[in-house]
């Protein structure tokens, strides 16, 4: 069993192994911050939950705004160097947040962090795009995602200690540890081999990506699909508490199931994404699975605690299948559909789909699943079926490679 788990998070490829090690350090720290950050700044510092949420929204908007320029930089300069610098600056910025007392300073620092993070993420995606071709690149992304889930899950568990102690010092310790994790990740990233930029430094910024309508529409459709991540993080917790008789702790149980499934099966399922044509079919299949899970979630309303818990568990199991398959398909489409010399900017565009979904998704989901209940889940199911079919139609002329 242990050997199986290790095989799903430790790549046989030494380059991917070094990438994932740095990623684990980084996401371990992120898990700590995401658990205590909003609580610390909202209630310990006293900025208020709404104002803190607004600051995160502004930061996300900054990240979206620099996606394309950050991609241009990733194509023209060393992805390794950009990755190292981004980790260092994020660590310093996060460390400064411990001393924040006002909303304006907090927001400025958060925007700076999001700004730097976008450059680092685009550089890392550009690097992975050069690891290999086709299925090998998808497998590398799968290892990264499995380790991400393991890191965030582990960091969340450690942050639980701070929540239990519930003192300013405990919360500050978690934030400082996250800041240090960025610096350690930068150190680990120095062991990653250099890869050459795909473009020359003197080449002008090419905005033709914005005219690549096929890629832009695929990005938008994938952004619509990524709404399912917010179903897990926002819709399900609110739905369970407000509309079902399942115990609140069951939310943690099904989320733990999701985390462990990604760690154990993301790499295995990635081996099925052989080429772009296969990925297009898998994207539609994944969308269907998520649609079915929405219908199952909706059925948990109005039944006793045992049945509600069982129904939610079944819904999450189907949802996990859609998430695993859909993630692999999304990575293949994102990288193989792109101009291979401009992976940085193309992956920057692709990330904008996620960003827009994160910005508008929470309000939409709450309005649907709480505002109109089971009908809202039905609408979501129809949405995912439509997204999958539209992607299939949009890319139907692509031949297998």
Outline where the language-model segments fall:
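Helix-loop boundary and gating motifs at the non-cytosolic
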Residues: 6-61, 214-258
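Transmembrane alpha-helix termini and helix-breaking/packing motifs in multi-pass membrane transporters
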Residues: 43, 154-172, 360-377
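Conserved MFS/SLC helix-loop-helix module at the cytosolic interface between two early adjacent transmembrane helices
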Residues: 64-101
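Helix-to-loop junctions at the C-terminal end of transmembrane segments
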Residues: 65-78, 163, 264-281
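Structural signature of the two symmetry-related core transmembrane helices
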Residues: 81-95, 179, 281-297
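Cytoplasmic helix-loop-helix junction between adjacent transmembrane helices
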Residues: 109-148
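C-terminal membrane-cytosol helix-exit motif in multi-pass small-molecule transporters
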Residues: 160, 180-198, 390-394
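C-terminal transmembrane helical hairpin of 12-TM major facilitator-type secondary transporters
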Residues: 280-326
């Amino acid at each position: 069993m242990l050997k199986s788990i290790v095989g799903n998070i430790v790549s046989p490829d030494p380059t991917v192994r070094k990438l994932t090690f740095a990623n684990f350090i980084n996401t371990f720290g992120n898990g700590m911050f995401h658990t205590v950050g909003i609580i610390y700044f909202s209630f310990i510092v006293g900025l208020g939950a709404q104002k803190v949420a607004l600051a995160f929204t502004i930061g996300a908007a900054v990240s979206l705004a620099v996606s394309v320029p950050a991609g241009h930089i990733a194509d023209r300069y060393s992805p390794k160097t950009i990755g190292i610098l981004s980790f260092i600056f994020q660590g310093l910025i996060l460390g400064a947040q411990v001393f924040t007392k006002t909303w304006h300073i907090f927001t400025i620092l958060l925007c700076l962090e999001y700004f730097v993070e976008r450059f680092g993420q685009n550089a890392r995606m550009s690097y992975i795009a050069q690891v290999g071709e086709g299925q090998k690149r998808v497998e590398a992304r799968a290892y990264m995602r499995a380790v991400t889930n393991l890191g965030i899950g582990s960091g969340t568990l450690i942050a639980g200690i701070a929540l239990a102690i519930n003192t300013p010092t405990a919360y500050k310790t978690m934030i400082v540890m996250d800041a240090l994790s960025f610096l350690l990740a930068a150190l680990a990233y120095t062991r990653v081999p250099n890869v050459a930029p795909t473009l020359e430094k003197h080449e002008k910024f090419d905005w033709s990506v914005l005219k690549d309508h096929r890629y832009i529409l695929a990005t938008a459709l994938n952004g619509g699909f990524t709404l399912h991540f917010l179903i897990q993080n926002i819709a399900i917790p609110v739905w369970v508490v407000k509309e079902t008789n399942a115990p609140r702790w069951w939310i943690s149980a099904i989320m733990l199931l999701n985390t462990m499934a990604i760690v154990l099966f993301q790499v295995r399922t990635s081996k099925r994404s052989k080429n772009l044509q296969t990925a297009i079919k898998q994207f539609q299949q994944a969308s269907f699975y998520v649609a079915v899970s929405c219908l199952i979630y909706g059925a948990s309303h109005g039944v006793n605690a045992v049945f509600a818990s069982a129904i939610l568990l079944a819904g999450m199991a189907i949802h996990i299948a859609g998430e695993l398959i859909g993630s692999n398909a999304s990575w293949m489409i994102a990288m193989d559909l792109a101009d291979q010399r401009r992976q940085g900017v193309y992956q920057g565009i692709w990330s904008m789909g996620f960003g827009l979904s994160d910005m508008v998704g929470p309000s939409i989901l709450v309005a649907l699943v709480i505002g109109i209940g089971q009908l809202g889940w039905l609408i979501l199911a129809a949405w995912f079926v439509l997204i999958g079919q539209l992607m299939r139609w949009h890319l139907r002329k692509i031949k297998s490679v």
